[in-house]
Amino acid sequence: TSTITLSLPMNVYEQVELQNDIGNLTLQNVHADRISLKSDTGDMDLQSITGKSCSITNNIGSLSLQEVQIREQTDIQQDTGDLELTDCTFHGSSAISTQIGSMHLSDSEFSAATIESDTGDIRLKDCTFYQVCTIKSDVGDVKGSLLADVNNTSIDADTDVGSISIDGKKNGYQVPNALNTLTIRVDTGDIRLTTQQPTA
């Protein structure tokens, strides 16, 4: 397997665009207004990335993002393979989707986000959702932990086939005029979440 390594001077770039047919793609310590990444077959690994907007398309292979901060708009499309987000912050609006594969979202913040999975579990660990966010799963469980002020966050959960438990409640938290709203919809699968008050 051949490897191509590109080293860029430390700078804030207007645009970084990479396209890959076959092979793994690793991107580290990049700061750009616009980031566009496309890969057909291979794993993608992003670490310490900041930008205004980010578009990632991965057809076959795993996708891992760590310490990625996007200020305005995020679009992540993962076709076949697992998706892992760790210590990430997505402000503005974000659309994150997988077709076949599990999602693992850890210690990350989302604003105005839509997170969708066709086939595969969605695992959350200490994630925070601001404004109006939606999690959808066709076949797979939604499980884990949230950082949420339940006095200012409305959590609306529903599954067609499966059970629901949010802090032991079957209906989540219905808060009138809530600052933040998280809607969870599952066709076939369980919803099991716990909440913890975020630290100031």
Feature annotation, model-predicted:
Residues 8-11, 21-25, 184:
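N-terminal segments that cap or nucleate solenoid repeat domains
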Residues 3-5, 17, 157, 183:
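Extracellular beta-sheet/turn segments enriched in Thr/Pro/Gly and aliphatic residues
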Residues 2-10, 29:
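Extracellular beta-strand-rich solenoid/capping regions of secreted or surface-exposed proteins
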Residues 8, 13-14, 92, 130:
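Extended, structured, electrostatic nucleic-acid-contact surfaces
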Residues 15-71, 75-77:
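Right-handed parallel beta-helix
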Residues 1-2, 198:
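Secondary-structure transition/turn motif
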Residues 54, 63-200:
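Short, surface-exposed interaction patches in beta-rich subdomains
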